[in-house]
């Protein structure tokens, strides 16, 4: 897995790349506050079959920051601009958490960009669309994640900053991905960790059934970041 930089408008966007340059492109998209670092184990599993690209969206990880925190729609636009700058007109995309909302927003508006989608732990479950509802679930899931992931998240959150985190989270909580699902024609796999405290199985089933070509797979015993804790199992689903 190697670092890769691309200029997108006024910003430099950092990504990690792996796999043969002539293999089909697969983009891995991170969640709220974190960089693509926690996608690296999965990228390594996928690299023999795919050209894997793991961007840090603007303001996340090592990428330059936009002047202000981007909304879900703004992040989707940033993803589209990065895909264009990379010369990637059509890709398979796997996203986690907030990244699923970004992917859904872009795929609903520009469906021709996506061959296939994999949504891992898609947010936001309508029952928990407030900071008060989400905070306890964050801590419950945190105790189910490995310590190695906690270290990655701590570094990424410190870099992202509390004000940008709050603004981005506010946009995510106000987003309604369920209203966009019917406009996504790409085959889409919804993946949920069986011990994911962030999103319920009922919500993930609603996402899968709301998609014209959706399917739900539950990976038993795994938390929200199932792609990190069970990369080989998730890679086998892609």
Task: Tell what function each PLM region has.
Residues 11-62:
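Conserved HGGG/HGGXW glycine-rich cap/lid loop of the alpha/beta-hydrolase fold
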Residues 73-91:
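Conserved acidic catalytic loop of the alpha/beta-hydrolase fold
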Residues 101-109, 113-145:
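Flexible "cap/lid" loop of the alpha/beta hydrolase fold
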Residues 150-179:
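Hydrophobic, aromatic-rich cap/lid helix
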Residues 177, 186, 200-209:
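Short alpha-helix in the alpha/beta-hydrolase fold that links the catalytic acid
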Residues 183-184, 190-192, 196:
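Short beta-strand/loop motif that positions the catalytic acidic residue
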Residues 208-225:
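Catalytic histidine neighborhood in serine/cysteine hydrolases
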Residues 222-235:
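Catalytic histidine-centered segment of alpha/beta-hydrolase-like enzymes
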């Amino acid at each position: 897995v190697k670092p890769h930089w691309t200029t997108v408008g006024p910003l430099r966007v950092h990504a990690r790349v792996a796999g043969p340059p002539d293999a089909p492109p697969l983009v891995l998209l991170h969640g709220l506050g974190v960089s693509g670092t926690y996608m690296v184990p999965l990228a390594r599993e996928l690299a023999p079959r795919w050209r894997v690209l793991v961007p840090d969206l603007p303001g996340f990880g090592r990428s330059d920051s936009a002047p202000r925190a981007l909304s879900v729609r703004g992040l989707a636009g940033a993803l589209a601009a990065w895909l264009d700058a990379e010369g990637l007109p059509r890709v398979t995309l796997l996203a986690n958490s907030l990244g699923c909302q970004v992917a859904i927003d872009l795929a609903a508006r520009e469906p021709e960009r996506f061959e296939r989608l994999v949504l891992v732990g898609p947010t936001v479950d309508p029952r928990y669309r407030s900071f008060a509802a989400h905070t306890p679930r964050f801590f419950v899931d945190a105790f189910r994640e490995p310590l190695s992931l906690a270290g990655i998240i701590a570094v990424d959150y410190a870099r992202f900053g509390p004000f940008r985190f709050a603004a981005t989270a506010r946009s995510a909580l106000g987003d309604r991905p369920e209203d966009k699902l019917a406009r996504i024609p790409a085959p889409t796999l919804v993946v949920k960790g069986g011990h994911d405290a962030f999103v319920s199985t009922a919500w993930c089933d609603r996402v899968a059934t709301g998609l014209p070509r959706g399917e739900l797979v539950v990976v038993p015993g795994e938390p929200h970041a199932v792609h990190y804790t069970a990369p080989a199992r998730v890679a086998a689903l892609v």
